[in-house]
Amino acid sequence: MTIFKRISSPALLALALFGGAAHAALVPPQGYYQGIEKLKTGEGNFRCEAAPKPYTGPLQFRSKYEGSDKARATLNAASEKAFRTSTEDITTLEKGVSKMVGQYMRDGRPAQLDCTLTWLGSWARAGALLSTDYNHTGKSMRKWALGSMSGSWLRLKFSNSQPLAAHQAEADLIEKWLSRLAEQTVRDWSDLPLEKINNHSYWAAWSVMATAVATDRRDLFDWAVKEYKVGANQVDDQGFLPNEIKRKQRALAYHNYALPPLAMIASFAQANGVDLRAENNFALQRLGEGVLAGARDPSHFKARAGKKQDMTDLKVDSKYSWLEPWCALYHCVGDTLERKHDMQPFNSFRLGGDVTRVYDPSAESKK
């Protein structure tokens, strides 16, 4: 099937028409080729839980910031509880797939792989998460889930152990569904005004990038790169993102939250011969350095955002998962490298699981 037959979005069509000549197949960073860590015999104590019910309803969810002012920085406990309840099956799928893929890549037990394929296959057959009846929180859940699933899928797809070789029909079904989700995600997040482009758009672009490589879709890859460039060019000379500064007391936390998708996109682009490191005068490096400095002394963020910073998230090691791809891009040394080593291993289900095993596998053996 040609790229033109698959495209249903004007944004993707434009990229397809002007994307140039044919390219080599898309690939992930080198760490995704790793095989099973240590093949275990027997079933062990792994038990395949029943798959969460495929979510096929409208993607209309309450925001956990419901009722907050325009800074969107104050949690609403009641609406957060409603959000968690209504999205529970989606989050269970994300976390479950990430965990099972991690277990399989560690142990190689067939039951772990079979369960992963059963879960994803049931959602793919149901056409889950494809509703076009959605609000902002709903389309946000769609792209988060897509990034989680495609990020995990990459570890199976490209592993030298070739776990999907004996499951090609199921893999094709799942990848077709991931492609459809990516196409809808492109429609969801294209053509936004600059003042509306923030961390959500970066996470959408990461989910599309992961899917692009998992399904070898150059049109999706090009869209993700385009969105990355928009994000990188939002970083000002001081390393701030104006649309995250608006989050007032959570400005620093949201700068930190913007980094994982941007760093992953740049890493995947580099693996395919597209070097984004210097975009907007090394914006990604500047952003990361600013967050690391802010985590130590948030006074600059307080001055810029006009509020004392909420440091809760900045004390959680896993929130710095972006350090793995970022340090691979910019070759961290000294204090930054030491901080990374102190916090490893990094595991983020929204990035597909154990990012330390992908980017710095020798570090895990030292723990």
From Swiss-Prot:
Swiss-Prot/TrEMBL keywords: Lyase, Periplasm, Signal
Q: Which residues bind substrate?
A: S63, K64, H136, T137, Y254
Predominant place of localization: periplasm
Task: Look up the signal peptide feature and give its range.
Answer: 1-24
One GO term (biological process): alginic acid catabolic process
Q: Which InterPro entries match?
A: Alginate_lyase, Alginate_lyase_dom, Chondroitin_lyas
Show the GO cellular component annotation of the record.
periplasmic space
Q: Where in the cell is it found?
A: Periplasm
Reaction(s) catalysed (UniProt annotation): Eliminative cleavage of alginate to give oligosaccharides with 4-deoxy-alpha-L-erythro-hex-4-enuronosyl groups at their non-reducing ends and beta-D-mannuronate at their reducing end
Which EC numbers characterise this protein's activity in its record? 4.2.2.3
Q: Where are the transmembrane segments?
A: none
The Swiss-Prot or TrEMBL record describes its family as follows: Belongs to the polysaccharide lyase 5 family.
- Protein name (database record): Alginate lyase
Species source reads Pseudomonas putida (strain ATCC 700007 / DSM 6899 / JCM 31910 / BCRC 17059 / LMG 24140 / F1)
Organism taxonomic ancestry: Bacteria, Pseudomonadati, Pseudomonadota, Gammaproteobacteria, Pseudomonadales
